[in-house]
Amino acid sequence: MAKTAKKSGPKKAKRNVPNGVAHIQSTFNNTIVSISDTAGEIIAWSSAGASGFKGARKGTPFAAQTAAEAAARRALEQGMRQIEVLVRGPGSGRETAIRALQVAGLEITLIRDVTPLPHNGCRRPKRRRV
């Protein structure tokens, strides 16, 4: 019987990156936290879905907190100490994710809201009737 060879993909080299940028994309359905270096190369990322939440629970502040903690842990392993935070989107996990990054041990130097605002672009989705 043929044995399947164990695949070992290209391992990311552990590098020492002292400061970077945390991108928090918070929608009503999910929160994605990506931490990059100053050049834009992603160091660590996590999301509410990757943290084990499913369905409507992905949009909760607690799910955003868990995702931010997981991303911060991976970034701290790479030697990150200071971050700038760029927040995008209207979701409920915005503030919670920022607080979780701070509690995890990352020093926040800047918080900026980069939510895209349309100058009367696409038509909005129709109103929900429940």
UniProtKB/Swiss-Prot annotation:
UniProt similarity note: Belongs to the universal ribosomal protein uS11 family.
Gene Ontology biological process terms, A to Z: translation
Keyword RNA-binding: yes
Function: Located on the platform of the 30S subunit, it bridges several disparate RNA helices of the 16S rRNA. Forms part of the Shine-Dalgarno cleft in the 70S ribosome.
UniProt keyword annotations, A-Z: Ribonucleoprotein, Ribosomal protein, RNA-binding, rRNA-binding
NCBIfam families xref list: PRK05309.1 (NF003698), uS11_bact (TIGR03632)
Pfam families attached to this UniProt entry: Ribosomal_S11
GO cellular component labels: ribonucleoprotein complex; ribosome
Molecular function in Gene Ontology: rRNA binding; structural constituent of ribosome
Lineage of the species this protein comes from: Bacteria, Bacillati, Cyanobacteriota, Cyanophyceae, Synechococcales
Quaternary structure and partners: Part of the 30S ribosomal subunit. Interacts with proteins S7 and S18. Binds to IF-3.
Cited Gene3D superfamilies: Ribosomal protein S11
Protein name listed in UniProt: Small ribosomal subunit protein uS11
Family matches, as PROSITE patterns: RIBOSOMAL_S11
Domain of life: Bacteria
